[in-house]
Amino acid sequence: MVTIRADEISNIIRERIEQYNREVKVVTIGTVLQVGDGIARIYGLDEVMAGELVEFEEGTIGIALNLESNNVGVVLMGDGLMIQEGSSVKATGKIAQIPVSEAYLGRVINALAKPIDGRGEISASESRLIESPAPGIISRRSVYEPLQTGLIAIDSMIPIGRGQRELIIGDRQTGKTAVATDTILNQQGQNVICVYVAIGQKASSVAQVVTTLQERGAMDYTIVVAETADSPATLQYLAPYTGAALAEFFMYLKQHTLIIYDDPSKQAQAYRQMSLLLRRPPGREAYPGDVFYLHSRLLERAAKLSSQLGEGSMTALPIVETQSGDVSAYIPTNVISITDGQIFLSADLFNAGIRPAINVGISVSRVGSAAQIKAMKQVAGKLKLELAQFAELEAFAQFASDLDKATQNQLARGQRLRELLKQSQSAPLTVEEQIMTIYTGTNGYLDSLEIGQVRKFLVELRTYLKTNKPQFQEIISSTKTFTEEAETILKEAIQEQMERFLLQE
């Protein structure tokens, strides 16, 4: 027979009393009124805050965006197919944040910073808010270091500095993403962390970019944030902010970062969809009234930090697609007014075989020569002037049949300079190679060659200079100026290579 021992029972009761933790948990709960199209209307949740995360019964997370008198409009971060009318929703008391760490380098993730490349979880000890305020005026300093893209046309005439925001704009299929990926490839060995954000792109296009980066070893210093065209609008809207939060993490660790948004007009479309479904009043082109703020708060996060904060930087390259060259549409004009310049890619130039198809005439960089090394400033000024004069002459020459010798020479020089700006995709040039190429063109060394021979000669000259006269590269990389000694070495190399080239031909 079982005996009941009073002392044992009293010990158990005493232990339980000691372990008793009096905790009152207050949870704000609401009820789903209606759900559909990625939007849920919720009754209750009286104390929910704008932008707060809410959790549905079946695990889906949403963001409270519309706080109305009798209900709350929530956008869903998922398909929400299992959410039922009448089910309960609880407020989490948090706003959207993501884990951040150096382990993200080389990975492909979604807008919630979850890996989507099938290579396992990513460990992270810290987290950052997806939407954090941009650095203030005192926290910044003016842009003064170059961020080399490896493209002659950009680095010589539309230079980009670390901490700048430069828009890449053009019609579809004009090589916008190619300019951005070439810039990532050119950061190899430059100690720059790159973040590529694909918003509403085809999954095949994103896969192609990732493959290119992997083949060239660029994924070692790159993070890809992808929300493809089949993702919910909420996640497409959040993806750029996730990318910015990751880039900021490295920026505040005194590192240089480059972030590419491809493209913010898709983000604006996702935001328009959410806003219209939430019954917010539509404005121009049916976009909501705060679509400017959508992009300005994102792009203002790019900065060159002051010396007190470690001089880290975040350079932003947003890519905007235009419809048949219409730069005056709503989103393009918004982004142009926020950024520090734009690189305009033209379909006509692309079809004429001028690639990268950069229209140098209407592309600008508002940072200008502050973002160039001295050596580049010394050779690039002449190039821009000669190309501008050539463009003017070319338009005039179409109507005039008999041109004097000087005009003919200027046209011939201009055609060779245009040839010199052409580059193959995924073949960025070092700054020393660019300086050598520009000097050769602007000083008339290419004038004696046929237009078709220019590129071949330049490729051979670069190889010849690298193998036979390595001191040229050493002078420019150490002094950052185009010294008389460097000029003498370059002139010798050009003459020697020209003799060899003409013998071959």
From Swiss-Prot:
<dbReference type="InterPro" id="IPR000194">
    <property type="entry name" value="ATPase_F1/V1/A1_a/bsu_nucl-bd"/>
</dbReference>
<dbReference type="GO" id="GO:0005524">
    <property type="term" value="F:ATP binding"/>
</dbReference>
<dbReference type="GO" id="GO:0046933">
    <property type="term" value="F:proton-transporting ATP synthase activity, rotational mechanism"/>
</dbReference>
<keyword id="KW-0406">Ion transport</keyword>
<feature type="site" description="Required for activity">
    <location>
        <position position="363"/>
    </location>
</feature>
<keyword id="KW-0813">Transport</keyword>
<dbReference type="InterPro" id="IPR020003">
    <property type="entry name" value="ATPase_a/bsu_AS"/>
</dbReference>
<comment type="similarity">
    <text>Belongs to the ATPase alpha/beta chains family.</text>
</comment>
<dbReference type="InterPro" id="IPR036121">
    <property type="entry name" value="ATPase_F1/V1/A1_a/bsu_N_sf"/>
</dbReference>
<comment type="function">
    <text>Produces ATP from ADP in the presence of a proton gradient across the membrane. The alpha chain is a regulatory subunit.</text>
</comment>
<keyword id="KW-0934">Plastid</keyword>
<dbReference type="Pfam" id="PF02874">
    <property type="entry name" value="ATP-synt_ab_N"/>
</dbReference>
<protein>
    <recommendedName>
        <fullName>ATP synthase subunit alpha, chloroplastic</fullName>
        <ecNumber>7.1.2.2</ecNumber>
    </recommendedName>
</protein>
<keyword id="KW-0793">Thylakoid</keyword>
<feature type="binding site">
    <location>
        <begin position="170"/>
        <end position="177"/>
    </location>
    <ligand>
        <name>ATP</name>
    </ligand>
</feature>
<keyword id="KW-0066">ATP synthesis</keyword>
<dbReference type="Pfam" id="PF00006">
    <property type="entry name" value="ATP-synt_ab"/>
</dbReference>
<dbReference type="InterPro" id="IPR033732">
    <property type="entry name" value="ATP_synth_F1_a_nt-bd_dom"/>
</dbReference>
<keyword id="KW-0139">CF(1)</keyword>
<keyword id="KW-1278">Translocase</keyword>
<keyword id="KW-0150">Chloroplast</keyword>
<dbReference type="GO" id="GO:0009535">
    <property type="term" value="C:chloroplast thylakoid membrane"/>
</dbReference>
<dbReference type="GO" id="GO:0043531">
    <property type="term" value="F:ADP binding"/>
</dbReference>
<dbReference type="InterPro" id="IPR027417">
    <property type="entry name" value="P-loop_NTPase"/>
</dbReference>
<dbReference type="InterPro" id="IPR000793">
    <property type="entry name" value="ATP_synth_asu_C"/>
</dbReference>
<dbReference type="InterPro" id="IPR023366">
    <property type="entry name" value="ATP_synth_asu-like_sf"/>
</dbReference>
<keyword id="KW-0547">Nucleotide-binding</keyword>
<dbReference type="InterPro" id="IPR004100">
    <property type="entry name" value="ATPase_F1/V1/A1_a/bsu_N"/>
</dbReference>
<keyword id="KW-0067">ATP-binding</keyword>
<dbReference type="Pfam" id="PF00306">
    <property type="entry name" value="ATP-synt_ab_C"/>
</dbReference>
<dbReference type="InterPro" id="IPR005294">
    <property type="entry name" value="ATP_synth_F1_asu"/>
</dbReference>
<dbReference type="InterPro" id="IPR038376">
    <property type="entry name" value="ATP_synth_asu_C_sf"/>
</dbReference>
<keyword id="KW-0375">Hydrogen ion transport</keyword>
<keyword id="KW-0472">Membrane</keyword>
<comment type="subunit">
    <text>F-type ATPases have 2 components, CF(1) - the catalytic core - and CF(0) - the membrane proton channel. CF(1) has five subunits: alpha(3), beta(3), gamma(1), delta(1), epsilon(1). CF(0) has four main subunits: a, b, b' and c.</text>
</comment>
<dbReference type="GO" id="GO:0045259">
    <property type="term" value="C:proton-transporting ATP synthase complex"/>
</dbReference>
